[in-house]
């Protein structure tokens, strides 16, 4: 099975994540999308991070009606910090009958050269990139596929956190 891995802190998870995952599933070779909840990204601070189990449960509740979406806590049991390449290698070994690919936004693609063993990722895994804000993508590779026409949702986890801190409506 072709599994698209959508890594993130999902702090919090929102409808934009579901829309992107469903679109990638419907318009690429990905047959199922797994949201991989990262306990702590090596690229982010932990100061405002909700508990990892809480984030996992939120996603489980939000996707329970969609058999093409799943959530994984695989990184909870792996050594920290969690590096994407380590998780990919672990999953590839654990599930040899699956083909794994990555799902990421253009902002992450533009920073991929800062990731641990990014060259190995580029050589061994397809990467589906959803454009977010018309960012010029400065990296090209045969395994990078820009997914055109992904609905652009002007919502982000950081916006939701800001609205909550300002005691404004963040119900979307």
Question: Can you annotate each of these PLM segments?
Answer:
Residues 1-172:
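Nucleotidyltransferase catalytic core that binds NTPs
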